[in-house]
Amino acid sequence: MPLLFRGIRGTLRASVRKRIHMSPAAESTAYPHLFTPLDLGFTQLRNRVLMGSMHTGLEDRARDFPRLAAYFAERAAGGVGLIVTGGFAPNVVGWLKPFGGKLSWPWEVRPHRQVTRAVHDNGSKICLQLLHAGRYAYHPLSVAPSKLKAPINPFTPRALSARGVERHIADYARSARLAREAGYDGVEVMGSEGYLINEFIAPRTNQRTDRWGGDAAQRMQFAVEIVRRIREACGTDFIIIYRLSLVDLVPDGSNWTEIVQQAQAIEAAGATLINAGIGWHEARIPTIATSVPRGAFAAVTAKLKPHVRVPVIATNRINMPDVAERILAAGGADMVSLARPLLADPQWANKSRAGRPEAINTCIACNQACLDHVFENKTASCLVNPRAVHETELVYRPTSAARRIAVVGAGPAGLACATVAAERGHAVTLFDAGSEIGGQFNVAKRITGKEEFHETLRYFRHKLGETGVEVKLDTVADVAALAGFDAVVIATGITPRRVDFPGADHPKVVTYLDVLLGRVQVGEQVAIIGAGGIGFDVGEFLVHEGPSSALDPARWMAEWGVNPTFEGRGALAKPAPEAPARKVWLLQRSPGKPGARLGKTTGWIHRATLKAKGVTMLGGVTYLGVDDAGLRIRVDGQVQLLPVSHVVVCAGQEPRRDLHAALQAAGINAQLIGGADVAAELDAKRAIDQGSRVAAAL
């Protein structure tokens, strides 16, 4: 080890020599390890909850910083120990996109002070993430260690010169120094997920022959020098988190020996904490989607922990306090990182500390309003919490004039509307003809890999009681029942659309609700008409049987090809998908790739899952008819007979508005929300957002 590293390490370890064992003074809580303070020597974190970095779309313009400050302030007030911002580039070529978030000049400091002040005023600490996009930069100025285009980006990067590498190291140090001036307690250096620093480290993307390439020791020098220069620039009383890729999940990634060597070199260079990074963005293995088991990658953090002396942070799919406590109590990490769970519920930490997990609005890892929005250049939000990143715009103010409100339909839109209206002080009655709340949530929870919807239903059951909503199940609301209310909101949902071709009324033809709700037992060969989100869900439901691999990390890793020991380059193994429960054809009338309109960050996962299960996916299909022999179709001019036992129709839906029409005829105004308003696709994101906004305006 170089003497310079030893000197820095000795200085820091003398102060940090981490007191990360259970403190006798830890407050009494159901999760004692989670709420033990973490002593870093020069500062102390109030608990072990890290709000992990997530881009929101508010980082890119100074005019949005008041909103960014409000967003972080709400999480700080919610009890988080340490917050990490979304990524800010250390220079222009490191932008994620043109004119993206950047901190490289003194005049860019002032807006950040709103953010740091808001967080500190609410008792938390905050680090700015330094993220250079490298070859993932979505602009023509991109640079990388070598001129190698990423498979997920149309731009080919320019290879940095040796002088350019030195300038970049200086840029990182300057940005960190500016972050300190802005009031940040530290920085997180993004060294994972396939961004610039990770590109230097992995042989996959570093083909250099100078001192910044070659063997593992030379490939990691870029990262080590960045940490060392930041420590020199910012002093010993400044947090440096290093986001270290513990599993790349791509061919020619780092192996375990190299990862340990890198962690130790980063520690010696001056890092305060090491945060686990899991997978590159171009990896074909999901790492954060809802089908990934909770805490699936915590074991790799536990594997690293004995090799370093600085605290290590476990991450990915840790969405409930029992998962976090289990990881910490087992000694597998010193902190846990949560990003999306704190979008879903800014009070996550406070509720956990109070022993109220039932009150947590749990992240379901859908990505629909957070990551998908960011990749579509929209401001992020959250499917289950539309106030996320919109705290200054969507405000649930106490009403000055309480009214009697009727909400008809206890699906996503109705539940959101009823609970927000009651929270504001209205007297709310929620009607539903069914025997349980949930509507389409009760369908979604049955899909393999979507078990998290059980948590959403648990949350709304709790919220209904907490806010005092009167719930009337097994009740068909009619005009007479609704006549005495001050306002009526209709959230009666949808009716599946029928198809029109010969044999559409054949007993083989069933709706997706028939299948998912168990009204029909389908045979061993099934055709699905419609390859939208519902069609893919039905496909996954039909090819799986028995307990879901989303509940079993070992089975899930075997299916996707993750080496359970995390050895080997990229921690890859040969995928071993389990045999499908039945043969399925997934069909769509429109030409092109089935599932093309699925979520930007999750669609590929659904397609890969069905492909691995042998599902035949066809576009440009003409349906000729159904008879006792099966389904006849025409594709590319060729007629085929699919010898199926059932044809499941997932061809859209129509709004259910019978009650609304009756109320209008009786002269009673009522507002439509959710599927009763727009039924193009079953869209819980839009339904909850609309229901919440309508309630906020009542």
Model-flagged regions — what are they?
Residues 5, 12-408, 412, 417-428, ...:
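Flavin-dependent oxidoreductase catalytic cores
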